[in-house]
C-alpha cells in the first residue's frame, strides 16, 4: 500500500541529493518516477531540481493553481513514485492533492523540504505535510558553528543575522545557514 512520506531537514542536509538518488534507484530498475518542485524555486532555473554538489535534473514545476492529482492521474504511464522537492512552498491544496495521489492512485509520494522558516514558523506546505503524512523522517545535518544537530535555519544579510522579514526569499548558502538552537539565538557571526 502506498504512503505519503515527509522528509524534512534544514539547509544543506542533503534533501535534494536524496531525491536524485531515489529517482536513480527506481529508474535503474526500469520504474518511472515523476519529480516535481515548487515553481517558486528558480535558483538554478525554472523546473530544475539541483543539489549543492552539482547534480541537477528537470522537474515539473508546481504552482498553486496546478491540480497535482489530475496531472498524475492523466499520465500515460503510471509512475512508481512521485518525488517532491521544496515541499515547504506547497499550498494546502497541493498537499491534499498529494494525499489523494497516494490514497486513490496507490502511488507513493515522497515530499522533501524545510520544516520551519528563519523565524521558526512552519511553512504552509510543511504544516499540512506534518498533518497528513503517513511517515515523517528528519534528514539530519550539523550546525555550521558546532557539532550539534542543526534544527533551525538562520537567515543572514551582509553577514548579519536577520529575524524579521518576508517568509519566502529564495537563496542558497550565502543567505541561509543550518544552525542548532543555541547558535540560532547567538550566532558566531
From Swiss-Prot:
Family per record: Belongs to the thymidine kinase family.
Reactions accelerated catalytically: thymidine + ATP = dTMP + ADP + H(+)
Subunit text: Homotetramer.
Primary gene name: tdk
EC number: 2.7.1.21
Organism whose genome encodes this protein: Streptococcus pyogenes serotype M6 (strain ATCC BAA-946 / MGAS10394)
Residues annotated as binding ATP: 9-16, 85-88
Active-site residues from the entry: 86 (proton acceptor)
Name the UniProt record assigns to this protein: Thymidine kinase
Binding site residues for Zn(2+): 143, 146, 180, 183
A GO CC term attached to the entry: cytosol
GO terms (BP aspect): DNA biosynthetic process; thymidine metabolic process
One GO molecular-function entry: thymidine kinase activity
Gene3D superfamilies in UniProt: 3.30.60.20, P-loop containing nucleotide triphosphate hydrolases (3.40.50.300)
InterPro entries recorded: P-loop_NTPase, Thymidine_kinase, Thymidine_kinase_CS
EC class of the enzyme, as a word: transferase
Compartment annotation: Cytoplasm
Keyword match ATP-binding: yes
Main localization, broad class: cytoplasm
NCBIfam families for the chain: PRK04296.1-4, PRK04296.1-5
Alphabetized UniProt keyword annotations: ATP-binding, Cytoplasm, DNA synthesis, Kinase, Metal-binding, Nucleotide-binding, Transferase, Zinc
Amino acid at each position: 500500500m502506498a504512503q505519503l512520506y515527509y522528509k524534512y531537514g534544514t539547509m544543506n542536509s542533503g534533501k535534494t541529493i536524496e531525491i536524485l538518488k531515489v529517482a536513480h534507484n527506481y529508474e535503474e530498475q526500469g520504474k518511472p518516477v515523476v519529480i516535481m518542485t515548487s515553481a517558486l524555486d528558480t535558483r538554478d532555473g525554472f523546473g530544475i531540481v539541483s543539489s549543492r554538489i552539482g547534480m541537477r535534473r528537470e522537474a515539473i514545476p508546481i504552482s498553486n493553481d496546478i491540480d497535482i492529482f489530475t496531472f498524475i492521474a492523466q499520465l500515460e504511464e503510471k509512475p512508481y513514485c512521485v518525488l517532491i522537492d521544496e515541499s515547504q512552498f506547497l499550498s494546502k491544496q497541493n498537499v491534499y492533492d498529494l494525499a489523494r495521489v497516494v490514497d486513490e492512485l496507490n502511488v507513493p509520494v515522497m515530499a522533501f523540504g524545510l520544516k520551519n522558516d528563519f523565524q521558526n514558523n512552519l511553512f504552509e506546505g510543511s504544516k499540512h505535510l506534518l498533518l497528513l503524512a503517513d511517515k515523517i523522517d528528519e534528514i539530519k545535518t550539523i550546525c555550521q558553528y558546532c557539532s550539534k544537530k542543526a534544527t533551525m535555519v538562520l537567515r543572514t544579510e551582509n553577514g548579519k543575522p536577520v529575524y524579521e522579514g518576508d517568509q519566502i526569499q529564495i537563496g542558497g548558502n550565502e543567505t541561509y545557514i543550518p544552525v542548532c538552537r543555541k547558535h540560532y539565538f547567538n550566532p558566531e557571526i
